Protein backbone atom coordinates (compact mmCIF):
# COMPACT_ATOMS: atom_id res chain seq x y z
CA UNK A 1 0.00 0.00 0.00
CA UNK A 2 1.38 3.41 -0.97
CA UNK A 3 1.86 6.21 1.53
CA UNK A 4 -0.99 8.16 -0.07
CA UNK A 5 -3.35 5.19 0.21
CA UNK A 6 -2.32 4.64 3.83
CA UNK A 7 -3.05 8.22 4.84
CA UNK A 8 -6.33 8.25 2.90
CA UNK A 9 -7.43 5.11 4.71
CA UNK A 10 -6.47 6.59 8.08
CA UNK A 11 -8.44 9.78 7.36
CA UNK A 12 -11.51 7.68 6.50
CA UNK A 13 -11.04 5.70 9.72
CA UNK A 14 -10.72 8.95 11.68
CA UNK A 15 -14.01 10.22 10.30
CA UNK A 16 -15.81 6.91 10.75
CA UNK A 17 -14.63 5.98 14.23
CA UNK A 18 -13.92 9.36 15.84
CA UNK A 19 -16.20 11.97 14.22
CA UNK A 20 -19.40 10.12 13.27
CA UNK A 21 -20.13 8.80 16.82
CA UNK A 22 -19.94 12.27 18.40
CA UNK A 23 -23.65 12.92 17.85
CA UNK A 24 -24.89 9.41 18.57
CA UNK A 25 -25.28 9.67 22.36
CA UNK A 26 -26.21 12.26 24.95
CA UNK A 27 -23.91 14.24 27.20
CA UNK A 28 -22.58 12.24 30.13
CA UNK A 29 -22.95 13.72 33.58
CA UNK A 30 -21.33 15.35 35.41
CA UNK A 31 -18.39 16.42 33.21
CA UNK A 32 -19.86 16.82 29.73
CA UNK A 33 -22.95 18.73 30.79
CA UNK A 34 -20.87 20.97 33.05
CA UNK A 35 -18.36 21.95 30.37
CA UNK A 36 -21.07 22.31 27.74
CA UNK A 37 -23.04 24.68 29.96
CA UNK A 38 -20.07 26.80 31.11
CA UNK A 39 -18.79 27.29 27.56
CA UNK A 40 -22.29 27.96 26.22
CA UNK A 41 -22.77 30.64 28.88
CA UNK A 42 -19.54 32.31 27.71
CA UNK A 43 -20.78 32.18 24.14
CA UNK A 44 -24.20 33.61 24.95
CA UNK A 45 -23.24 36.08 27.67
CA UNK A 46 -19.95 37.35 26.28
CA UNK A 47 -18.01 36.98 29.55
CA UNK A 48 -14.79 35.29 28.41
CA UNK A 49 -12.85 36.12 31.58
CA UNK A 50 -14.66 34.72 34.61
CA UNK A 51 -16.04 31.14 34.37
CA UNK A 52 -19.61 30.71 35.64
CA UNK A 53 -21.46 27.42 36.07
CA UNK A 54 -25.26 27.80 36.16
CA UNK A 55 -24.67 31.52 36.57
CA UNK A 56 -22.52 31.01 39.69
CA UNK A 57 -18.79 31.66 40.07
CA UNK A 58 -16.86 28.50 39.23
CA UNK A 59 -13.13 28.86 39.79
CA UNK A 60 -11.95 25.25 39.61
CA UNK A 61 -10.25 25.71 36.21
CA UNK A 62 -8.95 28.59 34.06
CA UNK A 63 -10.65 29.54 30.82
CA UNK A 64 -8.87 28.22 27.71
CA UNK A 65 -10.57 24.82 27.81
CA UNK A 66 -13.95 26.51 27.97
CA UNK A 67 -12.93 28.80 25.12
CA UNK A 68 -12.19 25.81 22.88
CA UNK A 69 -15.49 24.08 23.68
CA UNK A 70 -17.31 27.38 23.13
CA UNK A 71 -15.53 27.73 19.79
CA UNK A 72 -16.79 24.29 18.81
CA UNK A 73 -20.34 25.31 19.64
CA UNK A 74 -19.94 28.61 17.80
CA UNK A 75 -18.73 26.89 14.62
CA UNK A 76 -20.78 23.67 14.62
CA UNK A 77 -23.78 24.71 16.70
CA UNK A 78 -24.86 24.18 20.29
CA UNK A 79 -25.20 20.45 19.80
CA UNK A 80 -23.46 17.22 20.75
CA UNK A 81 -20.94 17.47 17.91
CA UNK A 82 -20.10 21.08 18.71
CA UNK A 83 -19.52 20.31 22.39
CA UNK A 84 -17.21 17.35 21.72
CA UNK A 85 -15.22 18.45 18.68
CA UNK A 86 -12.55 20.21 20.77
CA UNK A 87 -11.57 16.91 22.40
CA UNK A 88 -11.33 15.15 19.03
CA UNK A 89 -9.19 17.91 17.53
CA UNK A 90 -6.89 17.94 20.56
CA UNK A 91 -6.49 14.16 20.35
CA UNK A 92 -5.79 14.29 16.61
CA UNK A 93 -3.12 16.93 17.18
CA UNK A 94 -1.52 14.79 19.89
CA UNK A 95 -1.45 11.85 17.46
CA UNK A 96 0.28 14.11 14.94
CA UNK A 97 2.82 15.08 17.61
CA UNK A 98 3.50 11.39 18.28
CA UNK A 99 4.20 10.91 14.58
CA UNK A 100 6.46 13.97 14.31
CA UNK A 101 8.44 13.22 17.45
CA UNK A 102 8.98 9.58 16.47
CA UNK A 103 10.16 10.72 13.04
CA UNK A 104 12.59 13.16 14.67
CA UNK A 105 13.88 10.56 17.14
CA UNK A 106 14.39 7.61 14.80
CA UNK A 107 13.97 9.03 11.28
CA UNK A 108 12.03 5.99 10.14
CA UNK A 109 8.58 6.34 8.50
CA UNK A 110 7.40 2.90 9.62
CA UNK A 111 8.29 3.56 13.25
CA UNK A 112 6.65 6.99 13.12
CA UNK A 113 3.41 5.55 11.78
CA UNK A 114 3.40 2.69 14.30
CA UNK A 115 3.92 5.08 17.23
CA UNK A 116 1.10 7.34 16.06
CA UNK A 117 -1.28 4.42 15.53
CA UNK A 118 -0.54 2.93 18.93
CA UNK A 119 -1.12 6.25 20.64
CA UNK A 120 -4.36 6.88 18.71
CA UNK A 121 -5.73 3.48 19.71
CA UNK A 122 -4.71 3.41 23.38
CA UNK A 123 -7.98 2.80 25.20
CA UNK A 124 -7.74 5.83 27.49
CA UNK A 125 -6.71 8.20 24.70
CA UNK A 126 -9.27 6.97 22.17
CA UNK A 127 -12.02 6.82 24.79
CA UNK A 128 -11.47 10.39 25.94
CA UNK A 129 -11.31 11.73 22.39
CA UNK A 130 -15.10 11.75 22.11
CA UNK A 131 -15.72 13.01 25.64
CA UNK A 132 -16.17 16.72 26.32
CA UNK A 133 -13.76 17.50 29.11
CA UNK A 134 -10.47 19.33 29.52
CA UNK A 135 -8.03 16.39 29.72
CA UNK A 136 -7.52 15.86 25.96
CA UNK A 137 -6.82 19.57 25.54
CA UNK A 138 -4.46 19.73 28.51
CA UNK A 139 -2.70 16.57 27.33
CA UNK A 140 -2.13 18.14 23.92
CA UNK A 141 -0.53 21.25 25.41
CA UNK A 142 1.75 19.17 27.65
CA UNK A 143 2.65 16.96 24.70
CA UNK A 144 3.38 20.02 22.57
CA UNK A 145 5.59 21.55 25.25
CA UNK A 146 7.75 18.44 25.55
CA UNK A 147 7.90 17.80 21.80
CA UNK A 148 9.00 21.43 21.41
CA UNK A 149 11.64 20.84 24.09
CA UNK A 150 13.11 17.91 22.17
CA UNK A 151 13.07 19.88 18.91
CA UNK A 152 14.87 22.72 20.70
CA UNK A 153 17.50 20.39 22.15
CA UNK A 154 17.96 18.59 18.84
CA UNK A 155 18.00 21.75 16.72
CA UNK A 156 20.75 22.22 14.17
CA UNK A 157 20.69 26.01 14.20
CA UNK A 158 20.29 28.83 16.69
CA UNK A 159 17.09 29.98 14.98
CA UNK A 160 15.49 26.54 15.27
CA UNK A 161 16.57 26.32 18.90
CA UNK A 162 15.01 29.70 19.67
CA UNK A 163 11.76 28.73 17.96
CA UNK A 164 11.66 25.46 19.91
CA UNK A 165 12.03 27.18 23.27
CA UNK A 166 9.47 29.84 22.35
CA UNK A 167 7.00 27.15 21.28
CA UNK A 168 7.64 25.37 24.57
CA UNK A 169 6.72 28.54 26.45
CA UNK A 170 3.60 29.16 24.37
CA UNK A 171 2.43 25.58 24.96
CA UNK A 172 3.05 25.90 28.70
CA UNK A 173 1.06 29.12 28.71
CA UNK A 174 -1.91 27.56 26.95
CA UNK A 175 -1.69 24.49 29.19
CA UNK A 176 -1.78 26.79 32.21
CA UNK A 177 -4.85 28.56 30.83
CA UNK A 178 -6.48 25.15 30.37
CA UNK A 179 -5.80 23.45 33.68
CA UNK A 180 -3.35 25.38 35.81
CA UNK A 181 0.16 25.18 37.21
CA UNK A 182 0.75 21.55 36.23
CA UNK A 183 1.38 22.77 32.69
CA UNK A 184 4.52 24.48 33.99
CA UNK A 185 5.60 21.77 36.40
CA UNK A 186 5.51 18.74 34.09
CA UNK A 187 7.97 20.09 31.47
CA UNK A 188 10.33 21.17 34.26
CA UNK A 189 10.20 17.67 35.77
CA UNK A 190 11.48 16.30 32.46
CA UNK A 191 13.78 19.09 31.27
CA UNK A 192 15.77 19.59 34.48
CA UNK A 193 17.12 16.04 35.01
CA UNK A 194 17.57 15.45 31.28
CA UNK A 195 19.65 18.58 30.75
CA UNK A 196 21.67 17.93 33.89
CA UNK A 197 22.38 14.44 32.53
CA UNK A 198 23.39 16.02 29.22
CA UNK A 199 25.44 18.67 31.07
CA UNK A 200 23.54 21.42 29.31
CA UNK A 201 22.32 23.27 32.38
CA UNK A 202 23.63 26.62 31.12
CA UNK A 203 21.43 26.22 28.05
CA UNK A 204 18.49 25.46 30.33
CA UNK A 205 19.02 28.68 32.27
CA UNK A 206 19.45 30.83 29.19
CA UNK A 207 16.80 29.50 26.87
CA UNK A 208 14.52 28.51 29.75
CA UNK A 209 14.12 32.19 30.59
CA UNK A 210 12.92 32.77 27.03
CA UNK A 211 10.32 30.00 27.43
CA UNK A 212 9.14 31.52 30.72
CA UNK A 213 8.77 34.90 29.04
CA UNK A 214 6.72 33.38 26.21
CA UNK A 215 4.49 31.58 28.74
CA UNK A 216 3.93 34.80 30.69
CA UNK A 217 2.99 36.68 27.54
CA UNK A 218 0.26 34.10 26.95
CA UNK A 219 -0.98 33.95 30.55
CA UNK A 220 -0.67 37.46 31.93
CA UNK A 221 -3.47 39.24 30.04
CA UNK A 222 -6.11 36.84 31.31
CA UNK A 223 -4.47 36.43 34.75
CA UNK A 224 -4.61 40.18 35.34
CA UNK A 225 -8.11 40.48 33.87
CA UNK A 226 -9.58 37.77 36.10
CA UNK A 227 -7.85 39.25 39.15
CA UNK A 228 -9.37 42.63 38.38
CA UNK A 229 -12.79 41.04 37.87
CA UNK A 230 -12.70 38.46 40.68
CA UNK A 231 -10.23 39.30 43.44
CA UNK A 232 -10.66 35.91 45.15
CA UNK A 233 -9.99 33.80 42.05
CA UNK A 234 -6.30 33.11 42.57
CA UNK A 235 -6.65 32.31 46.27
CA UNK A 236 -9.36 29.74 45.61
CA UNK A 237 -7.74 28.31 42.49
CA UNK A 238 -4.27 27.89 44.00
CA UNK A 239 -5.20 26.55 47.42
CA UNK A 240 -8.32 24.55 46.62
CA UNK A 241 -7.44 23.18 43.19
CA UNK A 242 -3.72 22.59 43.71
CA UNK A 243 -2.59 22.38 47.32
CA UNK A 244 -5.68 20.64 48.74
CA UNK A 245 -5.99 18.26 45.80
CA UNK A 246 -2.34 17.28 46.05
CA UNK A 247 -1.76 17.11 49.80
CA UNK A 248 -5.03 17.73 51.65
CA UNK A 249 -6.44 15.10 53.97
CA UNK A 250 -9.85 15.75 52.43
CA UNK A 251 -8.62 15.66 48.83
CA UNK A 252 -11.18 14.67 46.22
CA UNK A 253 -10.84 11.23 44.62
CA UNK A 254 -8.33 9.97 47.19
CA UNK A 255 -6.57 6.79 46.03
CA UNK A 256 -3.54 4.73 47.19
CA UNK A 257 -0.11 5.58 45.78
CA UNK A 258 -0.05 2.52 43.50
CA UNK A 259 -3.40 3.38 41.83
CA UNK A 260 -1.81 4.38 38.52
CA UNK A 261 0.40 1.31 38.09
CA UNK A 262 -2.34 -1.16 37.08
CA UNK A 263 -4.24 1.68 35.42
CA UNK A 264 -1.29 2.35 33.13
CA UNK A 265 -1.54 -1.23 31.87
CA UNK A 266 -5.29 -0.90 31.29
CA UNK A 267 -4.84 2.49 29.59
CA UNK A 268 -2.63 0.84 26.94
CA UNK A 269 -5.22 -1.73 25.88
CA UNK A 270 -5.41 -3.22 23.30
CA UNK A 271 -1.59 -3.07 23.21
CA UNK A 272 -0.82 -3.91 26.85
CA UNK A 273 0.77 -7.22 25.91
CA UNK A 274 3.64 -5.29 24.30
CA UNK A 275 4.54 -3.48 27.52
CA UNK A 276 7.08 -6.02 28.88
CA UNK A 277 9.07 -6.20 25.65
CA UNK A 278 8.97 -2.41 25.20
CA UNK A 279 10.21 -1.76 28.74
CA UNK A 280 12.88 -4.42 28.36
CA UNK A 281 14.15 -2.84 25.15
CA UNK A 282 14.09 0.61 26.75
CA UNK A 283 16.27 -0.76 29.55
CA UNK A 284 18.77 -2.17 27.04
CA UNK A 285 18.89 1.22 25.27
CA UNK A 286 18.94 3.23 28.49
CA UNK A 287 22.07 5.16 27.50
CA UNK A 288 20.55 6.49 24.28
CA UNK A 289 19.35 10.09 24.53
CA UNK A 290 15.89 9.54 22.93
CA UNK A 291 15.11 6.66 25.28
CA UNK A 292 16.29 8.61 28.34
CA UNK A 293 14.12 11.57 27.34
CA UNK A 294 11.04 9.40 26.81
CA UNK A 295 11.64 7.46 30.03
CA UNK A 296 11.88 10.67 32.06
CA UNK A 297 8.72 11.95 30.39
CA UNK A 298 6.90 8.75 31.31
CA UNK A 299 8.22 8.07 34.81
CA UNK A 300 8.62 11.44 36.52
CA UNK A 301 5.09 12.76 35.85
CA UNK A 302 3.78 9.30 36.75
CA UNK A 303 5.64 9.46 40.07
CA UNK A 304 4.33 12.96 40.73
CA UNK A 305 0.73 11.95 40.05
CA UNK A 306 1.19 8.88 42.25
CA UNK A 307 2.32 11.06 45.17
CA UNK A 308 -0.80 13.21 44.90
CA UNK A 309 -3.67 12.28 47.21
CA UNK A 310 -6.31 13.14 44.63
CA UNK A 311 -6.27 10.80 41.63
CA UNK A 312 -8.43 10.32 38.56
CA UNK A 313 -7.67 7.96 35.65
CA UNK A 314 -7.36 10.79 33.12
CA UNK A 315 -4.58 12.52 35.08
CA UNK A 316 -1.97 10.17 33.57
CA UNK A 317 -2.87 10.94 29.96
CA UNK A 318 0.27 13.14 29.54
CA UNK A 319 2.36 10.03 30.34
CA UNK A 320 0.99 7.98 27.46
CA UNK A 321 2.63 9.60 24.44
CA UNK A 322 6.19 8.64 25.49
CA UNK A 323 4.95 5.16 26.33
CA UNK A 324 3.40 4.84 22.87
CA UNK A 325 6.72 5.86 21.32
CA UNK A 326 8.69 3.32 23.36
CA UNK A 327 6.18 0.60 22.46
CA UNK A 328 6.02 1.57 18.78
CA UNK A 329 9.81 1.60 18.53
CA UNK A 330 10.04 -1.85 20.11
CA UNK A 331 7.21 -3.17 17.92
CA UNK A 332 8.89 -2.17 14.66
CA UNK A 333 12.21 -3.62 15.82
CA UNK A 334 10.51 -6.96 16.39
CA UNK A 335 8.75 -6.84 13.05
CA UNK A 336 12.08 -6.32 11.31
CA UNK A 337 13.65 -9.21 13.20
CA UNK A 338 10.65 -11.45 12.56
CA UNK A 339 10.21 -11.85 16.33
CA UNK A 340 6.51 -12.57 16.92
CA UNK A 341 6.50 -13.61 20.59
CA UNK A 342 5.26 -10.30 22.02
CA UNK A 343 2.71 -9.85 19.25
CA UNK A 344 1.32 -13.34 19.74
CA UNK A 345 1.09 -12.69 23.46
CA UNK A 346 -0.76 -9.43 22.87
CA UNK A 347 -3.20 -11.13 20.51
CA UNK A 348 -3.81 -13.92 22.99
CA UNK A 349 -4.41 -11.36 25.75
CA UNK A 350 -7.02 -9.52 23.67
CA UNK A 351 -8.69 -12.78 22.66
CA UNK A 352 -8.83 -13.84 26.31
CA UNK A 353 -10.31 -10.50 27.36
CA UNK A 354 -12.99 -10.78 24.68
CA UNK A 355 -13.95 -14.28 25.76
CA UNK A 356 -14.00 -13.17 29.39
CA UNK A 357 -16.27 -10.23 28.49
CA UNK A 358 -18.57 -12.56 26.56
CA UNK A 359 -18.77 -14.98 29.49
CA UNK A 360 -19.47 -12.13 31.93
CA UNK A 361 -22.22 -10.75 29.68
CA UNK A 362 -23.83 -14.18 29.32
CA UNK A 363 -23.71 -14.73 33.09
CA UNK A 364 -25.29 -11.35 33.82
CA UNK A 365 -27.97 -11.80 31.20
CA UNK A 366 -28.94 -15.13 32.73
CA UNK A 367 -28.81 -14.03 36.37
CA UNK A 368 -29.82 -10.37 36.27
CA UNK A 369 -30.21 -9.11 32.71
CA UNK A 370 -28.31 -5.95 31.87
CA UNK A 371 -30.22 -5.63 28.58
CA UNK A 372 -33.98 -6.03 28.88
CA UNK A 373 -35.85 -6.05 25.57
CA UNK A 374 -32.99 -4.13 23.96
CA UNK A 375 -31.93 -6.36 21.06
CA UNK A 376 -30.18 -3.63 19.07
CA UNK A 377 -28.01 -2.49 21.99
CA UNK A 378 -27.21 -6.11 22.84
CA UNK A 379 -26.24 -6.71 19.22
CA UNK A 380 -23.90 -3.70 19.31
CA UNK A 381 -22.11 -4.86 22.44
CA UNK A 382 -21.74 -8.34 20.93
CA UNK A 383 -20.30 -6.69 17.83
CA UNK A 384 -17.74 -4.87 19.98
CA UNK A 385 -16.76 -8.10 21.73
CA UNK A 386 -16.64 -9.89 18.38
CA UNK A 387 -14.35 -7.25 16.88
CA UNK A 388 -12.07 -7.47 19.90
CA UNK A 389 -11.96 -11.27 19.66
CA UNK A 390 -11.35 -11.21 15.89
CA UNK A 391 -8.51 -8.72 16.28
CA UNK A 392 -6.93 -10.81 19.02
CA UNK A 393 -7.27 -14.01 17.00
CA UNK A 394 -5.80 -12.41 13.88
CA UNK A 395 -2.79 -11.03 15.74
CA UNK A 396 -2.23 -14.34 17.52
CA UNK A 397 -2.42 -16.43 14.32
CA UNK A 398 -0.66 -14.01 11.95
CA UNK A 399 1.41 -11.72 14.20
CA UNK A 400 3.73 -10.28 11.56
CA UNK A 401 1.06 -9.64 8.93
CA UNK A 402 -1.82 -8.66 11.24
CA UNK A 403 0.23 -6.71 13.77
CA UNK A 404 -2.14 -3.71 13.45
CA UNK A 405 -5.32 -5.72 14.11
CA UNK A 406 -5.83 -4.21 17.61
CA UNK A 407 -6.57 -0.89 15.91
CA UNK A 408 -9.88 -2.36 14.81
CA UNK A 409 -10.67 -3.53 18.33
CA UNK A 410 -10.05 -0.12 19.86
CA UNK A 411 -11.82 1.90 17.18
CA UNK A 412 -14.92 -0.30 17.04
CA UNK A 413 -15.08 -0.04 20.83
CA UNK A 414 -15.08 3.77 20.93
CA UNK A 415 -17.46 4.02 17.98
CA UNK A 416 -20.13 1.58 19.16
CA UNK A 417 -19.91 1.20 22.93
CA UNK A 418 -21.63 4.52 23.84
CA UNK A 419 -24.57 3.56 21.59
CA UNK A 420 -24.54 0.04 23.08
CA UNK A 421 -25.19 1.18 26.63
CA UNK A 422 -28.30 -0.33 28.24
CA UNK A 423 -31.29 1.96 28.59
CA UNK A 424 -31.05 2.24 32.36
CA UNK A 425 -27.50 3.62 32.04
CA UNK A 426 -28.51 6.06 29.29
CA UNK A 427 -31.51 7.26 31.30
CA UNK A 428 -29.39 7.76 34.41
CA UNK A 429 -26.24 9.26 32.90
CA UNK A 430 -27.43 11.34 29.91
CA UNK A 431 -30.39 13.42 31.13
CA UNK A 432 -30.07 15.96 28.30
CA UNK A 433 -31.78 13.46 25.96
CA UNK A 434 -34.78 13.35 28.29
CA UNK A 435 -34.80 17.14 28.44
CA UNK A 436 -34.66 17.33 24.63
CA UNK A 437 -37.79 15.17 24.39
CA UNK A 438 -39.75 17.72 26.45
CA UNK A 439 -38.45 21.03 25.14
CA UNK A 440 -41.96 22.17 24.19
CA UNK A 441 -43.21 21.66 27.75
CA UNK A 442 -40.10 23.30 29.23
CA UNK A 443 -39.84 26.34 27.00
CA UNK A 444 -42.60 28.27 28.75
CA UNK A 445 -41.41 27.58 32.30
CA UNK A 446 -40.70 30.73 34.31
CA UNK A 447 -38.57 28.94 36.91
CA UNK A 448 -36.33 25.85 36.70
CA UNK A 449 -35.49 23.61 39.65
CA UNK A 450 -33.32 20.49 39.98
CA UNK A 451 -31.91 18.31 42.76
CA UNK A 452 -28.80 17.26 40.82
CA UNK A 453 -26.00 19.33 39.28
CA UNK A 454 -25.68 17.02 36.27
CA UNK A 455 -29.39 17.21 35.52
CA UNK A 456 -29.43 20.95 36.21
CA UNK A 457 -26.59 21.61 33.76
CA UNK A 458 -28.26 19.41 31.13
CA UNK A 459 -31.45 21.42 31.61
CA UNK A 460 -29.57 24.71 31.38
CA UNK A 461 -27.63 23.71 28.25
CA UNK A 462 -30.65 22.43 26.34
CA UNK A 463 -32.74 25.49 27.24
CA UNK A 464 -29.84 27.96 26.86
CA UNK A 465 -30.55 29.28 30.36
CA UNK A 466 -28.30 29.47 33.43
CA UNK A 467 -30.96 30.29 36.02
CA UNK A 468 -31.63 26.79 37.38
CA UNK A 469 -32.33 26.83 41.12
CA UNK A 470 -30.80 23.96 43.10
CA UNK A 471 -33.08 21.83 45.26
CA UNK A 472 -31.39 20.63 48.46
CA UNK A 473 -27.98 20.29 46.80
CA UNK A 474 -24.80 22.37 46.56
CA UNK A 475 -21.88 20.10 45.64
CA UNK A 476 -19.12 21.75 43.63
CA UNK A 477 -21.14 24.99 43.54
CA UNK A 478 -20.73 25.48 47.28
CA UNK A 479 -18.20 28.26 46.66
CA UNK A 480 -20.34 30.08 44.10
CA UNK A 481 -23.37 29.87 46.38
CA UNK A 482 -21.41 31.43 49.25
CA UNK A 483 -21.66 34.88 47.64
CA UNK A 484 -24.57 36.83 49.19
CA UNK A 485 -26.12 37.76 45.84
CA UNK A 486 -26.51 34.06 44.98
CA UNK A 487 -27.69 32.72 48.33
CA UNK A 488 -31.24 32.24 46.99
CA UNK A 489 -30.10 29.94 44.17
CA UNK A 490 -30.22 26.89 46.46
CA UNK A 491 -33.38 25.90 48.32
CA UNK A 492 -33.10 23.64 51.39
CA UNK A 493 -35.55 20.81 51.88
CA UNK A 494 -37.42 22.57 54.67
CA UNK A 495 -38.17 25.60 52.50
CA UNK A 496 -39.17 23.92 49.24
CA UNK A 497 -42.94 24.16 49.60
CA UNK A 498 -42.80 27.84 50.47
CA UNK A 499 -40.37 28.51 47.60
CA UNK A 500 -42.59 26.67 45.11
CA UNK A 501 -45.67 28.59 46.26
CA UNK A 502 -43.96 31.93 45.70
CA UNK A 503 -42.35 30.85 42.41
CA UNK A 504 -45.64 29.56 40.97
CA UNK A 505 -47.29 32.90 41.59
CA UNK A 506 -44.74 34.32 39.17
CA UNK A 507 -45.23 31.65 36.50
CA UNK A 508 -44.96 27.91 35.83
CA UNK A 509 -42.13 25.88 37.39
CA UNK A 510 -40.29 22.98 35.75
CA UNK A 511 -38.70 20.53 38.19
CA UNK A 512 -36.18 17.93 36.97
CA UNK A 513 -35.24 15.30 39.56
CA UNK A 514 -32.84 12.36 39.54
CA UNK A 515 -34.23 9.68 41.84
CA UNK A 516 -31.42 7.45 43.12
CA UNK A 517 -32.09 7.12 46.85
CA UNK A 518 -34.69 7.35 49.59
CA UNK A 519 -33.84 11.02 50.14
CA UNK A 520 -34.47 11.71 46.45
CA UNK A 521 -37.84 9.99 46.67
CA UNK A 522 -38.68 12.17 49.67
CA UNK A 523 -37.76 15.26 47.62
CA UNK A 524 -40.20 14.07 44.96
CA UNK A 525 -42.92 13.46 47.56
CA UNK A 526 -42.70 17.08 48.72
CA UNK A 527 -43.72 18.41 45.31
CA UNK A 528 -47.36 19.43 44.76
CA UNK A 529 -49.50 16.77 43.11
CA UNK A 530 -50.95 18.93 40.36
CA UNK A 531 -49.45 19.64 36.96
CA UNK A 532 -47.94 17.24 34.44
CA UNK A 533 -45.34 14.58 35.22
CA UNK A 534 -43.07 12.66 32.88
CA UNK A 535 -40.78 9.82 33.88
CA UNK A 536 -37.92 8.03 32.16
CA UNK A 537 -35.99 5.60 34.33
CA UNK A 538 -34.83 7.50 37.38
CA UNK A 539 -35.55 10.91 35.84
CA UNK A 540 -38.76 12.73 36.72
CA UNK A 541 -39.89 15.97 35.11
CA UNK A 542 -42.75 17.86 36.77
CA UNK A 543 -44.36 20.88 35.10
CA UNK A 544 -46.17 22.84 37.81
CA UNK A 545 -48.56 25.48 36.40
CA UNK A 546 -48.84 29.03 37.61
CA UNK A 547 -51.16 29.65 40.57
CA UNK A 548 -52.96 32.77 41.64
CA UNK A 549 -51.86 34.55 44.83
From Swiss-Prot:
| One annotated GO molecular function | mannosyltransferase activity
Report whether rRNA-binding shows up as a keyword of the record: no
What parts of the sequence cross the membrane? Answer: 9-29, 80-100, 112-132, 136-156, 166-186, 204-224, 256-276, 288-308, 312-332, 346-366, 376-396, 402-422
Localization annotation:
Cell inner membrane
Q: What InterPro entries does UniProt report for this protein, alphabetically? A: ArnT_tfrase (IPR022839), Glyco_trans_39/83 (IPR003342), LipidA_mod_glycosyltrf_83 (IPR050297)
Tell me what reaction this enzyme catalyses: 4-amino-4-deoxy-alpha-L-arabinopyranosyl di-trans,octa-cis-undecaprenyl phosphate + lipid IVA = lipid IIA + di-trans,octa-cis-undecaprenyl phosphate
Listed under GO biological process in this entry are: lipid A biosynthetic process; lipopolysaccharide biosynthetic process; protein O-linked glycosylation; response to iron(III) ion
GO cellular component: a single term: plasma membrane
Q: Which first-to-last residue range defines the signal peptide?
A: none
Q: Which UniProt keywords apply?
A: Cell inner membrane, Cell membrane, Glycosyltransferase, Lipid A biosynthesis, Lipid biosynthesis, Lipid metabolism, Lipopolysaccharide biosynthesis, Membrane, Transferase, Transmembrane, Transmembrane helix
Keyword Lipid biosynthesis listed:
yes
Please state the Enzyme Commission number of this protein: 2.4.2.43
Q: What class of enzyme is it?
A: transferase
Protein topology in the membrane? Multi-pass membrane protein
Pathway in which this enzyme or protein is active: Lipopolysaccharide metabolism; 4-amino-4-deoxy-beta-L-arabinose-lipid A biosynthesis
Q: Which family does it belong to?
A: Belongs to the glycosyltransferase 83 family.
Its biological purpose:
Catalyzes the transfer of the L-Ara4N moiety of the glycolipid undecaprenyl phosphate-alpha-L-Ara4N to lipid A. The modified arabinose is attached to lipid A and is required for resistance to polymyxin and cationic antimicrobial peptides.
Supply the name of the protein. Answer: Undecaprenyl phosphate-alpha-4-amino-4-deoxy-L-arabinose arabinosyl transferase
Q: Which species is listed as the source?
A: Pseudomonas aeruginosa (strain UCBPP-PA14)
